[in-house]
Amino acid sequence: MQQLTEIVAQALAEVANASDLKALDDIRVDYLGKKGKITDMMKMMGSLSAEEKPAFGQAVNQAKQAVQQTLSERIDGLKASELEAKLIAEKIDVTLPGRTLELGGLHPVTRTIERIETFFGELGFVVKQGPEIEDDFHNFDALNISEHHPARADHDTFYFNPKVMLRTQTSGVQIRTMEHEKPPLRIISPGRVYRNDYDQTHTPMFHQVEGLMVAENVNFAELKGILHDFLRNFFEEDLQVRFRPSYFPFTEPSAEVDVMGKNGKWLEVLGCGMVHPNVLRSVGIDPEKYSGFAFGMGVERLTMLRYGVNDLRAFFENDLRFLKQFK
């Protein structure tokens, strides 16, 4: 019994001197584990008489309980001390103002597309979408683009094979629409297009919005009026606009549209023209009965002009300092 008393006293002293939870766990194993000092005392039961065993067993159990209770109290005390220290270290000044959540904003290119869609939507134009991986019929042949036209060159177009490529314009959407729907038609087709070019004013991927109107007696005067109104609406000022004769395989006559910049120079903003009869024939529309006009504009170019951005590549570099200016 004297030995048991000494072991308990030693255990309680070690518990009192322990400075962390790991030390306390080591003490628990050392005294109360399967091979612990107090647990081993039970082995002495075999050498005791029947009269001595009950008293000895009770003493060992009381010793275990005393050490376990002291351990539990010490563990609770250390945990409380650690929590208090942590709370002091992480003290929060509740008088400080809260942090506001920073909300995102629409990308300037998205803003431009939505602005274009809104204007033409009010004129009855429907938004149409199409595949970005296109075949040569919808990207070139149906648009009256000859086999040897420079637009088909490998250095301008991203080909998967000689018959399949990343679309170079959204005109394929117009072709697909005319294949499946009968006139009258009024559509615009915004989307990503791809060309092998990269500099201050070009990127390999950029956005276009093309428009198409096909019906009876559509004429160039209607085209001019709509585009003139669009440009004044988009730039929110009474711009000086001119239509300059040009050439596109898919329209005849064709024109490029310029606006007068604030520096007194003409700036090209889009191309347009009357749909070529060959394009109408390629989709089964009688050019003797129907006529139409088409136009196409680079979204990034319009965005650059509207917001005064000099380098097109800035739109796609994900620099928040730049993008936050358009919130």
Swiss-Prot record:
GO cellular component labels: cytoplasm
How and how many cofactors are bound, per the record note?
Answer: Binds 2 magnesium ions per tetramer.
Instruction: Say if the entry is tagged with keyword Protein biosynthesis.
Output: yes
Keywords of this protein's UniProt record, alphabetized?
Aminoacyl-tRNA synthetase, ATP-binding, Cytoplasm, Ligase, Magnesium, Metal-binding, Nucleotide-binding, Protein biosynthesis
Instruction: Identify the main location.
Output: cytoplasm
- Please tell me whether the keyword Lipid metabolism is annotated for this protein: no
Q: Which PROSITE patterns match?
A: AA_TRNA_LIGASE_II
Give GO terms for biological process: phenylalanyl-tRNA aminoacylation
Query: How is the quaternary structure described?
Result: Tetramer of two alpha and two beta subunits.
Its recorded name reads Phenylalanine--tRNA ligase alpha subunit
Q: Which organism is it from?
A: Shewanella denitrificans (strain OS217 / ATCC BAA-1090 / DSM 15013)
Q: What is the taxonomic lineage of the source species?
A: Bacteria, Pseudomonadati, Pseudomonadota, Gammaproteobacteria, Alteromonadales
